């Protein structure tokens, strides 16, 4: 996950400041030297790092420690505030017009940045917000680009406008606008051609589309794993074509994350969304304050709550709560809970948003067997409806049949049954989900659906 190494190094820096009554200039300079190295190793732009550490130093030297905070926590607060400022201070929304007024988005980027997939992800996101998007296939050069967009569009339930790979992209874009107007579609997403590198032909084609179509916003899709190259690409597109903002992809990968900390400061353009996985649902709104919290190892509880709310069917949750009270929890419910967890990105995604877990994910991920969840699902699906509803009837003969059907050893079936019984006992003691909004605990906690 992005920023793991940076998070770990920053936490080590802050630990050294604990126990001091006042932050001396020497304390701050030593700490900031380590912070500077950590940021540079995370591939943050050098000029950005220099300005960042200068700003933190000016605010931290001689700073009285606030009540209830130790010096380490005080520095964390200052660093947090500066990180938020660095990434944009406030969340920037895509400039989508209200109601049925047509918005045209031109999506641009280099090959390998997952642009076409991201365009489909964005269309699904807009559809979930009540918009009627239209995907437009203007990449007529890359083999299978049109097919890829059509397949992803179908999965998202979004229409894809295509005129094949023999037409001029400008003509396709113009025809798509007329099609959208005729069919009451209010957001047009133009998937333009990517290139292996920035060239004049590519830029001219983008300029031609902008000149012939009333584009409301040009959105650059860029690969976060390319580090400083991502920032350079953003700057080049901004200078030559003009962009309104960025979507960073592959932020769930083994990336140092420097692009997220540099793009706004270098280009002046905001980050709209970040791609956090391969699924079409893995596109998250970019919140500078939440990203700063993740970087500092303080988690992102608000995003987790939103994921839970979006993934859990409230009627289903109420029904499960009733079952738990009656101790009527069965394998159907167990399977539902697993599917809900999967919708939220899996165990690793959930843990990464919890406070204190940021710098520990490398160790924890080695202990998590995501494939075990797939095997568990296979075992449950190999049961008959009667067996899922009445786990008590699972004798040795039935378990052997289930193991053969799932392609696993019977020991895995026995292990699952044992885990199920343990979970059933624990569930009785866990507060359930209430109707409407998610049930918030006394300390701002929340109730997960499993």
Show where each model-derived region lies.
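Long amphipathic alpha-helical segments used for membrane anchoring, targeting, substrate engagement
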Residues: 3-20, 290-450
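Conserved phosphate-handling catalytic cores of large alpha/beta enzymes
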Residues: 173-177, 181, 185, 197, ...
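G-domain G4 guanine-recognition motif of GTPases
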Residues: 45, 111, 136-141, 163-165, ...
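Short, surface-exposed connector motifs at secondary-structure boundaries
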Residues: 129-134, 156-160, 188, 213-218, ...
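Residue-level signature of catalytic and energy-coupling elements of molecular machines
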Residues: 17, 43, 79, 110, ...
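Short, glycine/polar-rich helix-capping loops at beta-to-alpha or helix-loop-helix junctions
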Residues: 143-149, 230-233
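Primarily NTPase-proximal linker/entry elements flanking Walker-type ATP/GTP-binding cores
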Residues: 6, 12-138, 145-165, 173-192
